[in-house]
A protein has these predicted regions:
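Peptidoglycan glycan-strand catalytic modules in the bacterial/periplasmic cell-wall system
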Residues: 4-6, 10-198, 241-243
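Non-catalytic structural connector segments
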Residues: 198-244
Length: 244
């Protein structure tokens, strides 16, 4: 799938001078994702991810039985399908979403499963998700919220970011830290439930603060701003001339 990645500018010695973007996104490979992040995602969002072919009919039946109150039944692959191709029905009710949107997601999710490996689907999903505050994709989210690379995320940090996947506007750590802590606890609880985290570690993990190290991202930040702006203008001129 096509993605809009940030354009990064490097000096001759390899130091990054800055970047330009519509969305502050830079992809990471599955191999660079810490195990705790992948485990948190699967335990919380799609525990049968490795077994289904895009649609989890057991989860869907549960969602219908409880009118969506115990999860919407969407797999990670369906959520990726929604990100990539389908319209959003944010103002419609549960049954309207089930009738109008779910069939599209099923078809696209099944096709994605045929075209990509499970690991690739996880990476695609995390690379595209909007974590707000100029953090599009997991790499930007790790940098913006914790000042870290993705590989350097600790378990409780991974759990916070996975918790945001349910609704990043609601679980915005800069606006609702108490609610985000509660949601992080839910993610950790799921990891304990499925044997990824020992029960003996749950209380100590929940006691940790969010530990945010918010890094505001802007086009204007970084060395040589005038040079970067001149370079941007020159490159834009070359591309416009080529298109013309």
């Amino acid at each position: 799938p096509k993605t809009d990645l940030a354009t990064r500018i490097y000096a001759v010695d390899g130091v990054q001078l800055g970047s330009f973007y519509r969305e502050n996104r830079a992809d990471v490979r599955y191999a660079d994702l810490p195990p705790s992040l992948v485990q948190a995602l699967i335990c919380t969002e799609d525990v049968r991810f490795r077994d289904h072919t895009g649609v989890d009919f057991r989860g869907l039946a549960r969602a219908i039985a409880y009118l969506g109150k115990k999860g919407g039944g969407s797999t990670v692959t369906q959520q990726l399908a929604k990100q990539l191709f389908t319209e959003r029905y944010d103002r419609t009710g549960f049954f309207e979403r089930a009738v109008l949107q779910k069939p599209k997601e099923w078809i696209i999710a099944t096709r994605l499963e045929r075209q990509y490996t499970k690991d690739e689907i996880i990476a695609l999903y995390l690379n595209r998700y909007d974590f707000l505050n100029q953090a599009v994709g997991i790499r930007s989210a790790a940098q913006v919220y914790f000042g870290k690379s993705v590989a350097g995320l600790d378990l409780h940090e991974s759990a916070m970011l996975v918790g945001m996947l349910k609704n990043s506007a609601l679980y915005n750590p800069l606006r609702r830290p108490e609610l985000v802590l509660e949601r992080r606890g839910t993610v950790i609880s799921q990891m304990v439930k499925y044997g990824v985290v020992p029960a003996s570690a749950q209380d100590s993990l929940n006691a940790l603060p969010l530990g945010l190290s918010y890094q505001r991202v802007s086009h204007d930040e970084g060395p040589a701003p005038h040079f970067r702006e001149r370079l941007r203008a020159e490159v834009k001129g070359l591309l416009d001339a080529k298109d013309g």
